[in-house]
Swiss-Prot record:
Component of the ubiquinol-cytochrome c reductase complex (complex III or cytochrome b-c1 complex) that is part of the mitochondrial respiratory chain. The b-c1 complex mediates electron transfer from ubiquinol to cytochrome c. Contributes to the generation of a proton gradient across the mitochondrial membrane that is then used for ATP synthesis. The chain crosses the membrane at residues 34-54, 78-99, 114-134, 179-199, 227-247, 289-309, 321-341, 348-368. This is Cytochrome b. A ubiquinone binds at H202. The gene is mt-cyb. Heme b b562 binds at H84, H183. Binds 2 heme b groups non-covalently. It is found in: Mitochondrion inner membrane. The keyword Transmembrane applies. One of its GO terms (molecular function) is metal ion binding. SUPFAM superfamilies: a domain/subunit of cytochrome bc1 complex (Ubiquinol-cytochrome c reductase), Transmembrane di-heme cytochromes. It comes from the Eukaryota. Gene3D superfamilies: Cytochrome Bc1 Complex, Chain C.
């Protein structure tokens, strides 16, 4: 009998167990595609970022003009830049859908996989933030100033911490240089953590829409799900191409076409759309330290979800009350995203505060209590 090299070669064997002969539940739906989409997004971002880094200059006197140079003088530089900028938006769309899938179907009960995923989200947000500073436009500069300034809210060490991150007494050349270094380095850390994320996932196997053990009904990943993922790739690339070629500035801020000027503050300082929900939570608390802690907790609250799972069932597919609350959470997050982009005035302040309270209440009180109540109704206690 011929020896199959993919099953015997030390390196190919690992790839084989992860991508070819991986036993997968036969009933996983379209929502399970987003993990591979994120892998593709990461590869696209690293490759386009690498080519941009070849032409970019991390110096405050040249950063803005080097981005202009990339768009005007470098062969297909405009395309690489547009794909990289809009690829970040697509990355976050896929991440949020991936997290929503995990919350809906109870995938968070794979605690190690889930917690590494939350750390990955935090690193992704850090990478996107430092990357947004690099073009050195108005919103880049003021966004960096406002967000890094939040660290001064920490008692005693706050001011020292801010100056340490800035590398001086204001956002300046040292800040831009180190942010470029971080923006180059962090994606590779994300790549390494992604491998660990997959390692833990393959220890348990994938969850499925029913949230039940699927050991009795597994099929091989290739060709069934590899082709399913491939279809998803084509759809995703189509949307990315449409965005990058026809509407490259749709999700950006016009303010960033103005070179950074420390003497002129933009009328509304706001981050990219994918941070607006957390920014709205930050702004809805009058106290500075309280706002910073709420901002951090809005992400790290995801780590508490496995501990707050009170239901006897895993998935929400047979739990209509929790399903309704899940969609409340989705709607609430969309409202927070909208509020984050609005000026700080009534009625936006009040709506933001109500949405922020609702966001934390749904996670910490309402959903766990409803799950417990559903157990009682279904006599599952």
């Amino acid at each position: 009998m011929a020896i199959n090299i993919r099953k015997t070669h030390p390196l190919l064997k690992i790839m084989n167990h992860a991508l070819v002969d991986l036993p997968a539940p036969s009933n996983i739906s379209l929502w399970w595609n987003f993990g591979s989409h994120l892998g593709l997004c990461l590869i696209i971002q690293i490759l386009t970022g690498l080519f941009l880094a070849m032409h970019y200059t991390a110096d405050i006197s040249m950063a803005f003009s080097s981005v202009v140079h990339i768009c005007r003088d470098v062969n297909y530089g405009w395309l690489i830049r547009n794909i990289h900028a809009n690829g970040a938006s697509l990355f976050f769309i896929c991440v949020y859908l991936h997290i929503a899938r995990g919350l809906y179907y109870g995938s968070y009960l794979y605690k190690e996989t889930w917690n590494i995923g939350v750390i990955l989200l935090f690193l992704l947000m850090a990478t996107a933030f430092v990357g947004y500073v690099l073009p050195w436009g108005q919103m880049s500069f003021w966004g960096a100033t406002v967000i890094t300034n939040l660290l001064s809210a920490f008692p005693y060490i706050g001011d020292m911490l801010v100056q340490w991150i800035w590398g001086g007494f204001s956002v300046d050349n040292a800040t831009l240089t180190r942010f470029f270094a971080f923006h180059f380095l962090l994606p590779f850390l994300i790549l390494a953590l992604t491998v660990i994320h997959l390692l833990f996932l393959h220890e348990t196997g994938s969850n499925n829409p029913l949230g039940i053990n699927s050991d009795a009904d597994k099929i091989s990943f290739h060709p069934y799900f590899s082709y399913k993922d491939l279809l998803g790739f084509f759809v995703m690339i189509f949307f990315l191409a449409a965005l990058a070629l026809f509407m490259p500035n749709l999700l950006g801020d016009a303010e960033n076409f103005i070179p950074a000027n420390p003497l002129v503050t933009p009328p509304h300082i706001k981050p990219e759309w994918y941070f607006l929900f957390a920014y709205a939570i930050l702004r809805s608390i009058p106290n500075k330290l309280g706002g910073v802690l709420a901002l951090l907790f809005s992400i790290f609250i995801l780590m508490l979800v496995p501990l707050l799972h009170t239901s006897k069932q895993r998935s929400t597919i047979f739990r209509p009350m929790t399903q309704i609350l899940f969609w409340f959470l989705v709607a609430n997050s969309i409202i927070l995203t909208w509020i984050g982009g609005q000026p700080v005035e009534q009625p936006f302040i009040m709506v933001g505060q109500i949405a922020s309270i609702s966001y934390f209440s749904l996670f910490l009180i309402i959903m766990p209590f409803t799950s417990w109540w559903e157990n009682k109704i279904l006599s599952l206690n």
